[in-house]
Amino acid sequence: MQRDRAGGVGRAAINQAPLRRRTFDPRLRPFDLAANLVTTLRRSRAIPPDHLLRHVFETARDYADAKHILQATPVARPVIYTLVGCRPDERCIIERTEVGERTRCDDLVAANDWLDRLPHWEGRIVATKILTSTFEEAIENSRLRCEGLVQWRGSFALDSFGWLQPSVLNACTRIAVEMCPAHSILRAVGYELAAGRDLPDPVTLPCRLTLDRMVA
């Protein structure tokens, strides 16, 4: 998402936040999921996180305004926002609970867990492992993906999608996207998991869009 090149809001992404746990038995994860859903439906009248992000890009004046709205507005459920502006110092990750927030402007990677571990929160896992993965395995899943991004030393200009390696690339990957708001560039490529394969393969050619093409 982008408003304009000079002083625009920039671009953003959403990651699913960790799971609030009341139990620590893998077999009881469905109970925690259901309990969280009931709590949200019965008690929360706040805006859903994805609706808030859309509101930001429709109304925010600039990056600073967008950042403040994402930090301060109560949300219906926890979420992790990545926000990047059009200037070199405009970048942050905002970890949100329903009314709380933690913003960092370094360690700019995110998966599906808080950067700093908190009691009674568990990194998200794929649905097929919901009854079997241990608490430690759930933590490791997000940690490895973050480490894969941190260790990449490539270039946006020269190494398009070079960062998409295991564990960032995983069985659930279906689309990969690169965005540069400063130059109004968006790239995307689609993936599919073939029968008998552990990891998906690209099934589309990389698509590159610029602001001029998107407006046209």
Predicted features along the sequence, with ranges:
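C-terminal, well-structured catalytic/ligand-binding subdomain of enzymes
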Residues: 1-216
